[in-house]
Amino acid sequence: MKKKLALGILLLSAITVVAQQENDSIRKTKFKFNGGLESNAQWYLNDVERKIDQPESPLRSNNYLFLKANYGNFTVGTQVESYYKEALLNYNPAFEGTDFSLYWANYRSKILDITAGYFYEQFGSGMLLRAWEDRALGINTALRGGRINFKPTDGVSITALYGRQKSGFHVSDADVFGANADLDLATLFKQDSFGLTAGFSYILKNAEIDESVVDPKFDKETPAYSGRVGFSKGGFYAATEYNYKGEEPIYQPTTGLDYDFIKPGNALLVNLGYSQKGLGIDATLRRMENMSFLSDREPFVYQSNGDQLATNSLDYNDRVLSFTPALTKQHHSNLANIYVYQAQNRVNIDVTTNINKTGEIGGQFDVFYNFKKGSPLGGKYGTKVALNVSNWFNLDADFEFEDENGAYKPDYDAKFLGGGEKYFSDYNIEVSKKFSKNFRGNFMFINQYYNDRLIKGSFIENVVKTNILFAEGIYTFSGSRSLTVGAEHMWADNDRKNWASLLVEYNHNMNWSVFVMDMYNYGFEEEGNLIDDAYDLFKIHFYNAGITYRKNSSRFSLGYGRQRGGLVCAGGVCRFVPPSTGLSFTISTSF
Amino acid sequence: MKKIALLLLFVSTAALAQKELPNLNLKSLDNKSVNIKSDFNEKDKVYVYVFWATWCAPCIQELDAINDVYPDWQEELNMEVIAVSIDDARTGKRVKPLVNGRSWEYNVLLDTNQDLKRSLSIANPPYTIVVKNGAIVFEQAGHAPGSEHDFFKKLKSL
């Protein structure tokens, strides 16, 4: 009944959206209503050449209807989600059917903000607590409970919350309590010549201990806290944040939850920079040790189903409280997104593969510079240059594997400063230049180092070193018409070796655009040590074409093509997608 | 449950109210709390909110292109661009150096956990919202290179 109702609302509201947009009349009412609709559909097809059979339900869609009603200081809202007939391939199995996914009621005044129901939140940089949504990645880790935010005066913000973390249409079992204070000290003490901020967070996770555990050596409550300060003066700024996670048993994908392997975790983040008009310099350094903070003690397991192997919630970045993204540049180039670094926040001690890691240490460095108009390198329109470097290493640590009787008993001691083996590095430079009134270009060179064995914990020694060249030209004709051509090539010394890619996009006006693109992989040995050798063991064109129509707040697009199997990343988190071929259709609108 | 559904249905069919920005505070680049509604409410002034991210190439293209003609636009029309970054903790530290490094003249706000983006049901950046006298008078999903001229004509007509 509930599900049918939800589906009915979804459909009727979709019709209403269209109807509403026809009506331009503006009425002055105090009562406000708005929302949005998003639908991502795929029709998976057989691809004989790639030996891919369409799944049992080939037509799948993820649909989201968001509704919000506001009257003065009060707002109520809901989100209905429908996965019809099933969610898109490799989405979290917790997304199933049609139902109310979120609902909340909120009161907000200048000093008070109270929410009951589902809410999103982030404390500090989110390394201990971030409840967020990313539909493309199938992430929705909202908390269900209550939250109060209090701003007694300018420069003070205090939050207290309680909730259980959402997973699909359910919530996890553990209770999460949190408190946070952010102080803008410069404002509080009426100082204009510099900026000074401080913040503190406390989180308590209460998860039951399985009855089978005799005399547990840990508490069912895990505390975590963090502190941060920021300072700025003129163009200079500096900030640091320290996070500490209390002792809890460690979960490892290979050995599961080990009730005798109990460790705390911590993370340190330092950010320094200088910027003025035309120049920006920034350095971000981070060290993380055992910083995976789950909302339950261990990931929720989804049994194997048909041709789908057993997976767990961690595979979908679900039931996770901490947000520890990779601090690397998120590239616009297609080929630079094949070997993507994922931040290493977990402990892994594995005697079979001899891959032992406890976290990561490293940093990212950026320089942005604008060569002014009229200068020798700036030319008539100026030249913009962006340099980015990132390097990430395993922590330097001593490991133990056995107790005095020779039984498996892992332990480690990680040094505070000191890097171990390198996980990943990325050195890149990007130049954007306007050549004439109608023509502009972007050029990029990217050099990456990707240590697959260490990052993924596999047996096979597989370090991939790549060099990528990317060039893009945009020519605009009169009347908002434009043509974009992007070409790139990647030289890789290992795995699937070389790739070439070409993209052509034509924008007819503000409303219509079409694109065709192809990615071609060549030069590899079929017998070589391929990272993912299950599919596409031949020289293959990954072609795609699509058409988009945009009007006001709505966007419709239709596409056809081949999806490479692998990681699809957005906002610093990646989702594994299986190889597929098919038609895609997306709608998004807000009202 | 049924009652709630009926209520929602009623609401979704009956309400055709004027659309406004939600009453939310965001942080500016110098860490000041800014109300996106009450701090941008000069009578008859045109406020252009561009939602963007450091990883969104078309967004940067759009903001670069507007930046080139921004002084001319401001001379001809009482208008202001507010560039709302939806970068999260992964790329958020790159916002300030990028904005300065590209010599952007905009008022930049940070929607770090994407509360404003979500509240307005924005699916993907770039996304542009034009506000005049408290009401949302124009919205545009996406960006077409070279459409700045047409966009400015639109702004003048609002």
Residue ranges and their predicted role:
Chain A
Residues V80-S82, Y118-Y120, R287:
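A mature extracytoplasmic/lumenal domain signature
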Residues N70-D113:
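Post-signal peptide N-terminal segment of secreted/secretory-pathway proteins
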Residues S25-K32, Q42-R60, V76, K85-L89, ...:
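Signature for the C-terminal beta-barrel architecture of outer-membrane proteins
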Residues M1-F33, S590-F591:
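Bacterial Sec-dependent N-terminal signal peptides
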Residues Q20, G36-S39, G230:
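Beta-strand-dominated lipid-handling architectures at cellular/organellar boundaries
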Residues Y103-P152, I158:
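Well-ordered mid-protein domain cores that form the structural environment of catalytic cofactors
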